[in-house]
From Swiss-Prot:
This is Molybdenum cofactor guanylyltransferase. CDD domains: MobA. GO terms for molecular function: GTP binding; metal ion binding; molybdenum cofactor guanylyltransferase activity. InterPro entries: MobA-like_NTP_Trfase, Molybde_CF_guanTrfase, Nucleotide-diphossugar_trans. Keywords: Cytoplasm, GTP-binding, Magnesium, Metal-binding, Molybdenum cofactor biosynthesis, Nucleotide-binding, Transferase. One of its GO terms (cellular component) is cytoplasm. Transfers a GMP moiety from GTP to Mo-molybdopterin (Mo-MPT) cofactor (Moco or molybdenum cofactor) to form Mo-molybdopterin guanine dinucleotide (Mo-MGD) cofactor. GO terms for biological process: bis(molybdopterin guanine dinucleotide)molybdenum biosynthetic process. It catalyses: Mo-molybdopterin + GTP + H(+) = Mo-molybdopterin guanine dinucleotide + diphosphate. It comes from the Bacteria. Its main location: cytoplasm.
Length: 192
């Protein structure tokens, strides 16, 4: 089974715990968080887009297509995912958040293997501690179900995935980690 895949970095949230600062544009070391994410994604996949609901001009400077949620009012990652699924020409989209710069370099390979081997429409990451559903490979075939799910008022990402046959794919600490940065203090405490 040959499938086409593109990637979308989700940077469309309000970042309330970061004092409203745009997470993806915050600096860790000498680069913004989104630059760290791009640097980890590029060896894995070439077709990358950025989903953001503000600072589009700043994000466009990274050289990738930028788009906003079609649904208003910052409705969470599923809103960005739905917009991406409606716009893509790919069979699947690899989603990553903009605030998690150390995710595994084999993220796409393992999620793609799970999709192919288990013939599922969604595979998402987990580690020894918990599930990380924003790191997922999702089929465009789910866009209608996702549209109806959001229209019903639901916003729970993991619930949507489980209701639609999503499977978790385990990653070890050695492969990378899913530590994200939610506050400016988190960034200040981290040395790279």
């Amino acid at each position: 089974m040959t499938i086409t895949i593109s990637a979308v970095i989700l940077a469309g949230g309000k970042a309330r715990r970061m004092g409203g600062q745009d997470k993806g544009l915050q600096i860790l070391g000498k680069q913004s968080l989104i630059e760290h994410v791009i640097n980890r994604l590029q060896p894995q996949i070439h077709q990358i887009s950025i989903n953001t609901n503000r600072n589009q001009t700043e994000y466009a400077k990274f050289g990738f297509p930028v788009f906003s949620d079609e649904l208003p009012d910052f409705q969470g990652p599923l809103s960005g995912m739905l917009t991406a699924l409606e716009k893509t020409k790919s069979d699947f989209i690899l989603f990553t958040p903009c605030d998690t710069p150390f995710f595994p370099m084999n993220l796409l390979d393992k999620l793609k293997s799970a999709v192919k081997n288990d013939r599922t429409l969604i595979a998402y990451a987990c580690d020894e501690e918990r599930e990380h559903p924003v790191f997922c490979l999702m089929s465009v075939q789910l866009k209608e179900k996702l549209r109806h799910y959001l229209a019903s008022g639901e916003r729970r990402l993991l619930q949507f995935m489980k209701e639609n046959g999503g499977i978790s794919v385990k990653f070890t600490q050695e492969e990378g980690n899913f530590e994200n940065f939610n506050t400016l203090d988190d960034l200040k405490k981290t040395v790279i």
